[in-house]
Swiss-Prot record:
The lineage of its organism: Bacteria, Bacillati, Bacillota, Bacilli, Bacillales. GO terms for molecular function: oxoglutarate dehydrogenase (succinyl-transferring) activity; thiamine pyrophosphate binding. Belongs to the alpha-ketoglutarate dehydrogenase family. InterPro entries: 2oxoglutarate_DH_E1, 2oxoglutarate_DH_E1_bac, DH_E1, KGD_C_sf, ODO-1/KGD_C, THDP-binding, Transketolase-like_Pyr-bd. Its cofactor is thiamine diphosphate. This is 2-oxoglutarate dehydrogenase E1 component. SUPFAM superfamilies: Thiamin diphosphate-binding fold (THDP-binding). One of its GO terms (biological process) is glycolytic process. Its EC number is 1.2.4.2. It comes from Staphylococcus saprophyticus subsp. saprophyticus (strain ATCC 15305 / DSM 20229 / NCIMB 8711 / NCTC 7292 / S-41).
Length: 933
């Protein structure tokens, strides 16, 4: 057996990074003259088989007396790279005690200075041989680097090119990029960051502000990020963060004036101090929100070329804003105002996500959001993650809050580099940003920086942390703030004098005091306007521009025309060819899927882009949509909606990962950034949508009232009771109706394909306007192919969306009106078709919110012999629409007609688990509700 085969089969197991020397050794085995002469000598000492390099179960290198010197050196080098972070100087206070740290010293490997001085520095890294005289100097440098104020973790990364890039960037001697003037400017920025907090602490005692103190360097890190982004031509920055440090970021990154911030603490209208040049955009709703949830948008040239910096509005639900920011970023990167497919340019925008050390590993939304990072439909070219690590979560310390060494460890599964940096080492934090931004630019991947600091006060400024964390806070209270530490450093470096340092501190306080003095203390907000805007006074406008028969036929023909070299699966082709029938026969009907396709096509013809995502949305959960066709012979894909005649905007459909919260958050963010785009999320089954309940509750339905943030996101939630059990029946309609108020949404449960067509077009027409709002569709399952739902093409070329659809009736004969929606209406219609009764008028309530009370009232008033009104639903009485519609129906029927409910009784689970029992219950509901007596 040759040396080469022995080495290639050896159990070399140093983690992901084996070190540059092992690569050279492989080259040496193949061609000794291809490596430097000094290494040829060293490699020649390795006997056959001795290159079997392994590690023990603790991850520490096995060292035996018989090991060659070169192998021991390589083990030492590899251990420093892989485990040096465990001994790094990254803790400003309360350094944790490490146990079972792998061997990281020369002595552990039977090495000494003299031995290492006799070895070339090239054994450590190729470029070291031109920098250092020998391996000893190189290893000393490595130890300082890997055990310094930045701790590096990258050996877990699978991609060799990324590992090599990081290794060389880290190990190349760092040349300071900060000159004296830049250091002074950095110090002044820190003085403002810390001085702002101290001023608020002194003048607004006990007021909640969630101070940044302890991780103050976050602000200069962000400022440096913006400078680098500007140099790279990135003009749009999207930032997401929670409440900790938010006021400081608003003030010193987005340049919100001190007067505005102080006004908010005084409960005085801050908008009086909004810059008149329009550079700062702050929106608010009619109910408002606490100051540390609010965001803003700043257009500035402070960091180089003109940039638009956005800080996303955020609820108290930690980390949930992350996918929203990713969606906003992707919307900025996508070009959608052209026909066909979307094009994405990462350089247009970048996301910065600021996390908390307790929340980052604690909240599952981070796993979901990071999983989006390299997916074609969701990637943003790499997020910069900064963990503001104050090493405590409210009162919970790390050992009770996570099962890992670092709060950042969850990111390792996503193959991204991690840097831990001492928040008190100002210049190290700047270097960490520079490395992160360079890596992102090179590889378009996420990077995580763990900014390790502390929290100066309790969770909020009214909290006393010594009650639960006395030892930690004993040390923190003795610890000087970073602005003082850095100021003293500059004094010691003779860059500034002590008097200059103190003068800068005084200047900051004087600036804040002057801003405070501008505010009239008596100018209180006594009568705040909490009325919703006039644009929400009415339901969404549903007037539809008519579409000609010729236009729809041209679209339909185009959808059924394929490239000459593309084959459609024969079985599927038969299904699709049936879509010609509505245009070829009077008996032809347009089903749900075809109605949707025609609506989408006309919407893009009108210049509205469409983005549809969800699990299995390309085909459709129920194999109905077929928006992406697959050639059975070649696997090639074809999207018919990229072939729409006279198309003016893009169509995009994506299968999403198996996630609800992050994907819905992403689509919400996409929509609020590109308000003209018809952004749609489709649940695989509506039952699973409650995995995204936080997005519905805290963003979609309340964002406009809280923050003035308009959304027109559309939800498709398959919903109907069909004997498939309690987890495949209900989209929890009742929860969406509970969230409905102040005309904040449109919620429908439809029974007509043409009404669906008109609704989608109406929703699209309102996008980008002040009247836009979310649309929630309880979409069908079995009804997708039900001919009762399908309509002739004539209903598509005229009309508009109708909130109620009464069946044909003789007004004088009607004694009972049955109101129902969705599949319940269709079941009743099919029953009454077989068992006609002129005394009963069946009415489809297509729009549940805003409830069509006026339309129903007008209908009832036309029925002279009406005695009874019944609401019929599939869902249990405590679920579905009944609790919501009852007050409206009670008001309409009081002193006029009897009112009754028909449906399942109150249940804790939505539906029966047995299909036969389901049929019995469903039939009972139908028979009881249609009994005229």
């Amino acid at each position: 057996m040759s040396n080469e085969s022995q080495v290639s089969e050896a159990p070399v197991n140093f983690g992901a990074n084996l070190g540059y020397v092992l690569d050279l050794y492989d080259i040496y085995l193949d061609n000794p003259s291809a490596v430097p002469e000094d290494l040829q000598v060293l490699f020649s000492t390795i006997k056959n088989g001795e290159a079997n390099i392994a590690t023990n179960t603790e991850g520490q290198s096995n060292v035996t007396k018989g090991d060659s010197t070169i192998k021991r050196v390589m083990r030492l080098i590899d251990n420093i790279r892989q485990y040096g972070h465990l001994l790094a100087d990254i803790y400003p206070v309360n350094r944790p005690q490490r146990e079972n740290v792998p061997k990281l010293n020369m002595e552990d490997f039977n090495l000494d200075q003299e031995t290492l001085e006799s070895i070339s520095a090239g054994i450590v890294s190729e470029h070291f041989k031109d920098i250092y005289d020998n391996a000893y100097e190189a290893i000393v440098r490595m130890e300082k680097r890997y055990k310094g104020p930045i701790a590096f973790e990258y050996t877990h990364i699978n991609n060799n090119r990324e590992r090599v890039w990081l290794k060389r960037r880290i190990e190349t001697p760092y040349k300071a990029t900060l000159n004296d003037n830049q250091k002074i400017e950095l110090f002044k920025n820190l003085a403002h960051v810390e001085g702002f907090e101290k001023y608020l602490h002194k003048n607004f005692v006990g007021a909640k502000r969630f101070s940044i103190e302890g991780v103050d360097t976050l602000v200069p890190m962000l400022q440096q990020t913006l400078r680098i982004a500007s140099d790279e031509g990135i003009q749009n920055i999207q930032i997401g963060m929670a409440h900790r440090g938010r006021l400081n970021v608003l003030t010193h990154v987005l340049e919100k004036p001190y007067e505005m911030m102080i006004s908010e603490f005084m409960h005085i209208d801050p908008m009086k101090f909004l810059p008149e040049d329009g550079s700062l955009q702050l929106t608010s709703g009619w109910t408002g929100d606490v100051k540390y949830h609010l965001g803003g948008v700043k257009t500035t040239q402070s960091y180089g070329s003109e940039q638009r910096i956005s800080l996303a509005n955020n609820p108290s639900h930690l980390e949930i804003v992350a996918p929203v920011v990713l969606g906003k970023t992707r919307a900025n990167q996508d070009t959608t105002d052209k026909p066909g497919a979307v094009t994405t340019e990462f350089k247009k925008s970048m996301p910065i996500l600021i996390h908390g050390d307790a929340a980052y590993p604690g909240q599952g939304i981070n796993f979901e959001a990071m999983n989006l990072g390299n997916l074609e439909g969701y990637s943003t070219g790499g997020s910069l993650h900064i963990i503001t690590n104050n090493r405590i979560g409210f009162t919970t310390e790390p050992e009770d809050g996570r099962s890992t060494t670092y709060s950042s460890d969850v990111a390792k599964g996503y193959d991204v580099p991690i840097m831990h940096v001492n928040a008190d080492n100002v210049e190290a934090t700047i270097e960490a940003i520079e490395i992160a931004m360079a890596f992102r630019k090179e590889f378009n991947k996420d990077v995580v920086i763990d900014l390790v600091g502390y929290r100066r006060y309790g969770h909020n400024e009214m909290d006393e942390p010594s009650i639960t964390n006395p030892l930690q806070y004993y040390e923190i209270r003795k610890h000087e703030s970073v602005d003082i530490l850095y100021g003293k450093q500059l004094v010691n470096e003779n860059i500034i004098s002590e008097n200059q340092m103190n003068q800068i501190f005084d200047d900051v306080q004087n600036t804040l005091r002057a801003a405070h003095d501008k505010i009239d203390k008596n100018d209180k907000m006594d009568n705040p306007d909490m009325q919703k805007p006039d644009s929400l006074a009415e339901p969404i406008q549903t007037k539809d521009e008519e579409v000609s028969y010729e236009q729809l036929k041209e679209i339909n023909d185009a959808m059924l025309s394929y490239p000459s070299d593309f084959n459609v699966l024969k079985k599927l082709n038969k299904v699709l060819e049936k879509r010609r029938e509505p245009f070829e026969s009077e008996d032809g009907l347009v089903d749900w899927a075809q109605a949707e396709q025609l609506a989408f096509a006309t919407i893009t013809q009108n210049g509205r882009p469409i983005r549809l995502t969800g699990q299995d949305s390309e085909r459709g959960t129920f194999s109905h949509r077929h928006a992406v066709l697959h050639d059975p012979d070649t696997g090639a894909q074809y999207v018919p909606l990229h072939n729409v005649p006279d198309q003016k905007a893009t169509f995009e459909v994506r299968n999403s990962p198996l996630s609800e919260a992050a994907v819905v958050g992403f689509e919400y963010g996409y929509n609020i950034q590109n308000k003209s785009c018809m952004t749609i999320w489709e649940a695989q089954y509506g039952d699973f949508s409650n995995m995204a309940q936080m997005i519905f509750d805290n963003f979609l339905f309340s964002s406009r009232a809280k923050w003035g943030e308009r959304s027109g996101l559309t939800l498709f939630l398959p919903h109907s009771f069909e004997g498939q059990g309690p987890e495949h029946s209900s989209a929890r309609l009742e929860r969406f109706l509970q969230l409905a108020g102040e005309n904040n949404s449109t919620i429908v449960n439809l029974s007509s394909s043409s009404n669906y067509f008109h609704l989608l077009r109406a929703q699209a027409a309102n996008l980008g306007t002040q009247s836009m709002r979310p649309l929630v569709v309880m979409s069908p399952k079995s009804l997708l192919r039900n001919k009762t739902v399908a309509d002739p093409i004539s209903k598509f070329t005229s009309g508009k969306f109708e909130p109620i659809l009464p069946e044909a009736h003789d007004k004088a004969s009607v004694k009972k009106v049955i109101l129902a929606s969705g599949k319940m209406f269709i079941d009743l219609k099919e029953y009454l078709t077989k068992n006609p009764n002129k005394s009963i008028l069946l009415v489809a309530v297509e729009r549940l919110y805003p409830f069509p009370a006026d339309e129903i009232d007008a209908l009832l008033s036309e029925l002279p012999n009406l005695e009874h009104v019944a609401w019929v639903q599939e869902e249990p009485k405590n679920q579905g629409a009944w609790s919501f519609v009852y007050p409206y129906l009670k008001e309409l029927t009081t002193d006029k007609y009897d009112l009754s409910y028909h449906g399942r009784i109150q249940r804790s689970a939505p539906a029966e688990g047995d299909g036969e029992i389901h049929k019995l219950v469903q039939n009972m509901i139908i028979e009881q509700s249609t009994n005229i007596n």
